[in-house]
Amino acid sequence: LRRRGELVDKIELVVASSEPASALASLADLPETVGMVDIQDDCGILQLGSGPRLEVLVSTPAQFPWALWRGTGSQKHIDHLQAFAQKLGLKLDEEGIWVNGTQVVPASEAALYELVGLPFIPPEIREGRGEIEAASEDALPHLVELSDIRGDLHCHSRWSDGVLTIEEVAQAAQAKGYEYVAICDHSQSLKIANGLSPERLRQQHQQILHIREQLGFNLLSGIEVDILGDGSLDLLDSVLAERDVVVASIHSGFRQDEQQLTNRVIKAMENPHVDIIGHPTGRLLGRRSPYSINMEQVMQRAAITGSVLEINASPDRLDLNDVHTQMARSMGVKIAINTDAHSQVELDNMQDRKSVV
């Protein structure tokens, strides 16, 4: 949970208490608890009424920072820090940190990292993918905060399959302090989502211009245009050229082979009117695996064309993932964090995805 993982099969909590037996006994009174699966001296496993099981580890108050750090993981991060500390003559094990045979109890996670000569490493990047080396070189990346987000470039309205009016989307974006928001409804081939024809798109554009002037807000006229089976786009270039923002996405033909799918996306990026590739791997968490696509090839081309790849903040997608985002960063590819919101509540999904950046 602290590492903001995409999927979890259990909830692990660390509790500080000088009376572990009493703390564990009180867990049975939690409102979502339907039964105690197992209980030991300092650990309890509970079944919840819905969702994954709950595992609770009780630590003494003094040992809480250490227990929290180990519980947060990842195991690769723990292993790498143990190896790093060993080179300094320190020992890290399940009980704590040892200096010359004497246990040292850190007062916080920050103090723990300080003992091994490192700055605090945020939980979101404790994945064992170079963060310890980066910390040792004072090169940890900046994690994006909500205050860093300036706008949302992929929102839907009632004109296609959203539930908000264009004005409601704009007002919600204003309330969040955004500088801009883009209306990117679906294009005509996605009939199930009430996709827009060129004529409807021009009508919508006029409404956007009116609301933009009325609110004095940078409301952008966009489109989420379908990438068709051969890599061509669902709308003519002359129509796309009239848009402020063009998001190109695949919504069909997922079973093509890897090179076909890769070529489709690359061909779309080579269109000068395409700004962003939406949800680039097409996954739906728990329902549909990512389609076969060579993201390294895609990013190599994106770095040349200047195309932006989306981090789609929909909880069903979270696409790009953290691995691909790190790859994009290393290759100089631009990223846009968008909500793909179809409703008021979905505009808040920005909170879930900003952490991956």
Indicate where each model-derived feature is located.
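Short loop/edge segments at beta-strand edges and connector loops
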Residues: 221-223
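Charged catalytic cores and adjacent phosphate/nucleic-acid-binding surfaces used
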Residues: 2-157, 163-177, 181-183, 188-218, ...
